């Protein structure tokens, strides 16, 4: 079953809150992981692994570098769950 982008955003916000301590209300699609949310590369790996488990998708390492904003990650996960 495909998740809505809203559901994916909520799930990602919970993951980012757990990994980086960022309030879920601050996790918005336009926010940059590094610039706005202060998620470093190590934390990003944790976010990706948790997202893969939560959403049942695979995010290859070479794709992770393209996920600059929360919205990029939401779109990637939405597309990956549709094609899975």
From Swiss-Prot:
GO cellular component: cytosol; membrane
Annotated Gene3D superfamilies: ACP-like
Swiss-Prot/TrEMBL keywords: Cytoplasm, Fatty acid biosynthesis, Fatty acid metabolism, Lipid biosynthesis, Lipid metabolism, Phosphopantetheine, Phosphoprotein
GO biological process, one term: lipid A biosynthetic process
Domain Carrier: 6-81
GO molecular function per UniProt: acyl binding; acyl carrier activity
Residues recorded as bearing O-(pantetheine 4'-phosphoryl)serine in the entry: 41
Main location per the UniProt record: cytoplasm
Domain of life of the native organism: Bacteria
InterPro entries for the chain: ACP, ACP-like_sf, PP-bd_ACP
Subcellular location: Cytoplasm
Pfam families, alphabetized: PP-binding
PTM annotation, UniProt: 4'-phosphopantetheine is transferred from CoA to a specific serine of apo-ACP by AcpS. This modification is essential for activity because fatty acids are bound in thioester linkage to the sulfhydryl of the prosthetic group.
Pathway the protein takes part in: Lipid metabolism; fatty acid biosynthesis
UniProt family annotation: Belongs to the acyl carrier protein (ACP) family.
Function summary: Carrier of the growing fatty acid chain in fatty acid biosynthesis.
PANTHER family: ACYL CARRIER PROTEIN, CARRIER DOMAIN-CONTAINING PROTEIN
This protein's name: Acyl carrier protein
Organism of origin: Acidothermus cellulolyticus (strain ATCC 43068 / DSM 8971 / 11B)
UniProt lineage: Bacteria, Bacillati, Actinomycetota, Actinomycetes, Acidothermales
Gene name per UniProt: acpP
């Amino acid at each position: 079953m495909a998740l809505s982008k809203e559901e994916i955003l909520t799930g990602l916000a919970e993951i980012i809150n757990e990994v980086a301590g960022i309030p879920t209300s601050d996790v918005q699609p336009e926010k940059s992981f590094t610039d706005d949310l202060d998620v470093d590369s190590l934390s990003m790996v944790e976010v990706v692994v948790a997202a893969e488990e939560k959403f049942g998708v695979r995010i290859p390492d070479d794709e992770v570098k393209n996920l600059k904003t929360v919205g990029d990650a939401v779109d990637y996960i939405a597309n990956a769950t549709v094609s899975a």
